[in-house]
């Protein structure tokens, strides 16, 4: 369904008012709509001597970092005292949420299955649902060491954006969401400063001109009860596809995605090098400048220093999982966007 170009810009998933409090590595992306054995298999493809040297250098580097897993610092939010982090707000009454969802116009209900409903609304239509969106954002982001530290994760941008939501019919609760910004409308009323992405990256007029009309995406979350299921994220994307079918003028999608500070610097460096080598739009990246550029040491070896930078997503994910204390691989959203054909444009801190 999404046969259009999708432009994505990655950045930090945090409230704009907390830009100095949470220090995540952000990526700017755009769409067009290793286990040990994997390393060895790659090693066997070409010249024995060259591959042996590259393999040994590469593997030694990552083994050295594994020994220091226990020293990986906790995310900043987890180091905050409990007095700084406010308690999560009380949940909205489910009957009130159900009434708001049922009261939306039929054209705003995009996808329905036996268990779920995907729709969208603006903030004036769904007061209680917006409260629950802010509450669940904060819960989901805190769980990965991010979040605003406030009772609700809501910001000034929410008033001018649409809110895609996933509603669980079986449980009668909000299961997930995305924030969608219709860039042409936002720029017409508030200028480029009205875009959340512009607070993370300086977007040139040429960039805006090439993408517009476009949809800025971000602030995605899945309720913890549904995170182990594949359906919620897929259904949200079906909803995005249906929205584009209804509004075919939007040819491009762009927006920020974050790499949590819970990842070690080694893993982040490896992932960013992989993205720049294999999924980077060098031409369009000239029109985007990070507000706080990510700096990473050039001394980090990539295989074939290193002529053969890994170009397989699963291999990179396996390498990262070897480094990380909790064995996590490439972030879920980054994996999802890459499978949809995303290209990245810039990296921000």
How should these model regions be labeled?
Residues 1-86, 301-308:
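Non-catalytic C-terminal accessory region of glycerolipid acyltransferases
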Residues 82-91, 169, 323-324, 334:
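Intrinsically disordered, low-complexity linear regions
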Residues 65-69, 73, 142, 146, ...:
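Intrinsically disordered or highly flexible coil/loop and linker segments, enriched in small
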Residues 82-124:
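Conserved N-terminal entry element of GNAT/NAT acetyltransferase domains
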Residues 110-159, 163-167, 173-179:
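Short amphipathic alpha-helix that is part of the acyltransferase structural core
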Residues 11, 128, 138, 147-151, ...:
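Acyl-donor binding region in acyl/amide transferases
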Residues 33-35, 122, 219-224:
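Short, histidine-centered active-site or binding-site loop motifs used for metal coordination
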Residues 43-45, 346-349:
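Short, solvent-exposed helix-loop connector elements
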């Amino acid at each position: 369904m999404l046969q259009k170009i999708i432009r994505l810009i990655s950045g930090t998933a945090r409230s704009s008012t907390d830009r100095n409090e949470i220090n995540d590595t952000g990526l700017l992306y755009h769409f067009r709509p290793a286990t040990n054995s994997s390393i060895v298999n790659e090693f066997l493809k070409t010249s024995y001597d060259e591959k042996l040297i590259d393999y040994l250098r590469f593997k030694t580097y990552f083994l050295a970092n594994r020994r220091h897993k226990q020293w990986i610092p906790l995310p900043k939010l987890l180091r905050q005292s409990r007095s700084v982090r406010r308690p999560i707000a009380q949940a909205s009454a489910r009957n009130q949420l159900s009434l708001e969802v049922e009261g939306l116009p039929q054209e705003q209900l995009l996808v329905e299955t036996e268990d779920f409903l995907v729709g969208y609304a603006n903030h004036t239509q769904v007061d209680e649902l917006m409260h629950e969106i802010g509450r669940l954002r904060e819960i989901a982001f805190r769980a990965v060491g991010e979040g605003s530290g406030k009772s609700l994760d809501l910001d000034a941008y929410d008033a001018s954006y649409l809110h895609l939501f996933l509603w669980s019919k079986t449980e009668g609760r909000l299961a997930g969401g995305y924030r969608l910004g219709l860039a042409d409308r936002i720029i017409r009323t508030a200028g480029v400063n009205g875009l959340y992405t512009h607070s993370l990256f300086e977007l040139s007029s040429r960039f805006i001109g090439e993408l517009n009309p476009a949809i800025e995406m971000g602030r995605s979350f899945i309720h913890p009860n549904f995170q182990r299921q594949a359906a919620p994220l897929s259904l949200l994307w079906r909803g995005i596809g249906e929205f584009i079918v209804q509004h075919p003028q939007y040819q491009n999608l762009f927006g920020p995605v974050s790499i949590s500070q819970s990842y070690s610097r080694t893993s982040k460096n490896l992932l960013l090098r992989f993205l720049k080598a294999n999924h980077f739009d060098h031409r369009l990246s000239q029109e985007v400048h990070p507000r706080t550029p990510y700096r990473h040491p050039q001394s980090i070896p990539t295989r074939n220093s290193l002529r053969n930078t890994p170009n397989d997503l699963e291999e990179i994910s396996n390498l990262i999982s070897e480094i990380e204390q909790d064995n996590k691989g490439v972030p879920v959203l980054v994996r999802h966007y890459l499978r949809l054909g995303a290209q990245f444009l810039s990296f921000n801190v």
